[in-house]
Every structure is written in structure tokens, then in C-alpha cells.
């Protein structure tokens, strides 16, 4: 396994991490160039210049979609009279197999605070909320302390750095619903409403939280902003090995020797992460399949391990980069059981707002349970494939159901024989008496 040496030039997100895994508080953070990006942004650049710099750097959303952050920011209204605007941080990290944002919030809370400060200035937002997964108790404590430290130091609140810019930041803990990872469901929950996605348009940029212009960004996305402002566009683009700029928190979980999370340049291959960082599979286990970016991404096979971890390459292979935290599957794991477990999670976490998702996902679970018991019926696999089509992109209110069926459709594609093994074999003619199944004879007679 590789010995990682983190430097500001190669690991802009994680170079400040302590070896003892304790949080980096304000004094230490500032001694390591902390809030330098914020100083440059607030005292030397206009909001539009910051938006253009982030756009030119090529920063893409790190929550899974990979949409241009600068372009998303530029969708906010230019009308100066719309002076009540919100910046929301999506920290509702509940995707199974995903744990990258937790590291940043627990150990580098000021990095997120600085990223939100710069972003709020660029968006002309006067208030921000970190919508945090309720189970992340340590992250909540550390973020609130970091906000208090920043406020006392004049880095949050009124007239920040003497610029006349005001920005307040709050932590809001969720109530344990996965669907709040969808930005409009998050907004509804923040407002105290039922956490279901909203119809678009209007988009949050024009009518979001409390009907005001709102921008929602992922934790890791916001944490990339300070380094871009501190070091420049060209530097940010050059630390990548791909046309996707910058670095990414990537990892491997499953029954590997060293499961974990590492900051790596885009373009690093999945095989390199698995073998050089995660140490390969545990002794006695053979690699079988993997999901590139969390539970809601399509399975790929060993033949895909040499793909670079970047949005386009993984997309062309038939999956999504997602969160870039891959999950390894070994030869002892039955794909029907694994997919059934995933689909149970997605069915339970459906908000129930639209019929295809509300009824379709539990139906898939019912069929998978039967296949797992060896009691599947002829046509069950075809029904599952049909469900995948009916729950695909554009067929439901949000992206929950399309993501939920990605592991199902890909598991059938690559491991169909394991699903076929769960089909109950029909009686042959030798097992019939006058065309009647033996267990039905008593009912007939």
C-alpha cells in the first residue's frame, strides 16, 4: 500500500489533516494558510469575478451529478433588488457506502466554513445553512464550534473583514430521511414541510428556500473553493490527470484489506485505488464486481477496473462516478441477496410522492426475496427488467428511483445466471398424475 505524503500542492482538501485525527481548529487552520482564499476573494475580487474563476477552474459538483459549479452559481438572479438569498450546504450524506463528507466536517470544519463564506460572497447570499445528517453528531458539534470561532474572529457575522459583507451560518440537523439529499426535498425539510421533491421549474436558483433565490452545493464541492481562490485556476487544472479538474475524495469499501478514503487526482484508475491504496481483496477472496460511486450506481466488472475515475469514462462504461467511493464485491457474495438488500433500502427511503417509485420499488423487493429463497416464478426476471425501464430517468418525480434500479439492472446484465438460479423449476410430466400436481390431489379428491 502506498505511503501518502500530503502537500498543499497535491492534496488541497486533506493536507491539513492531523495524524491523531483530531479536528483542526481556527488557530491551527489559520497558521496553515486558512482563510487566505477568503481574504483574496472578499478584499480583491467582485462576486462575478469569483463566479467566473470557479467556472474557469472547471470545478464540478462532488455530490454525484458532476454539474459545473460555476455555471450553477451563474444561474442565480442578477437583479440586485432580490437581496434575500440563501446558500445551502447539502451535508445529508446517507448514500450507503459513502462517507467522504463526514471526514471533512469532523476533522476540517473550518475548510467548509471558509468555502461557504467565499461562495456566499459570490452569490450575494446573506445567510447559509448546513443541512446535516442527523446521525453525524460529532460533525454537528465540530461545525458549531467552528462557526462560533469564526464569528468571534470576525470571519462570520457583520462587516466581515471590513468589506461590508454580512453572512450568518447555521447548522440544521435532519431527521434521518435519505430523500433529503435531493435539493428541493432538502429545502422542503428545512422549511419544516414534508420532505418530498418539488416540481421544476421553478428551480431553486429563482425560487428556493422560503421562495427566495437559493443555491445548494455539496460539502466536498464547497471545500474545493478556497484552494481555487488561493492558488488560481491554472494550478487547479494541472493537479488532475484528467479533463475533470482538481482532486477527488475516492475510496474502496467491502472486504478489502485496507478500506478507506484518499484524496486523489481525477484520472486515477480504479485498479490503482483498489490495489495500491485499499490493498486488494482479503486473502482467499476473489474480486467479482464493483460499484464506482455508492449504492445507487450500476455494477461494473473486473474488466472495467483499468478505467480512469472520471465522469465521462465511467459514464461511457455504463455506470456513474457518483461519489467516487467504490464498493467491492467478492466471489462469496450472491448478487441476488446483495441487490435485494440495496433495493430494500431504496424502497424504505422513497418519499412516496409518485406512484412508480412508491409501488415499483417494493414490487422489485418482493420479487427479489422470492428469487433469493429459490421460489421465483418464470417471468420474474423479465418483470424486474421491465420495472427498471418504468423507473428509469424521466419516469419519476426525481432521480431517486432511477438511481435505485441502477444496481438491479446492471446485476441482471452481468450476473443473470444468479437470478435464473432462483427460479423455481416447474413440474415435468413425470411429476404429474393425470395432469395434476401431486400436492393438489387431496384438494381435488
Swiss-Prot record:
GO CC annotations on file: membrane; NADH dehydrogenase complex; plasma membrane; respiratory chain complex I
GO biological process, one term: respiratory electron transport chain
Annotated EC: 7.1.1.-
Cofactor info, note text: Binds 1 FMN.
Source superkingdom: Bacteria
Keyword flag rRNA-binding: no
Enzyme class: translocase
UniProt-annotated binding residues for [4Fe-4S] cluster: 351, 354, 357, 398
InterPro entries attached to this UniProt entry: NADH-UbQ_OxRdtase_51kDa_CS, NADH-UbQ_OxRdtase_suF, Nuo51_FMN-bd, Nuo51_FMN-bd_sf, Nuop51_4Fe4S-bd, Nuop51_4Fe4S-bd_sf
Reaction catalysis annotation: a quinone + NADH + 5 H(+)(in) = a quinol + NAD(+) + 4 H(+)(out)
Single GO MF annotation: metal ion binding
Binding site for FMN: 174-221
Residues of the signal peptide: none
Residues reported to bind NAD(+): 61-70
Obligatory cofactor(s): FMN; [4Fe-4S] cluster
Keywords from the named record: 4Fe-4S, Flavoprotein, FMN, Iron, Iron-sulfur, Metal-binding, NAD, Quinone, Translocase, Ubiquinone
Main function: NDH-1 shuttles electrons from NADH, via FMN and iron-sulfur (Fe-S) centers, to quinones in the respiratory chain. The immediate electron acceptor for the enzyme in this species is believed to be ubiquinone. Couples the redox reaction to proton translocation (for every two electrons transferred, four hydrogen ions are translocated across the cytoplasmic membrane), and thus conserves the redox energy in a proton gradient.
Subunit structure: Composed of 13 different subunits. Subunits NuoCD, E, F, and G constitute the peripheral sector of the complex.
Family: Belongs to the complex I 51 kDa subunit family.
Protein known as: NADH-quinone oxidoreductase subunit F
Annotated gene: nuoF
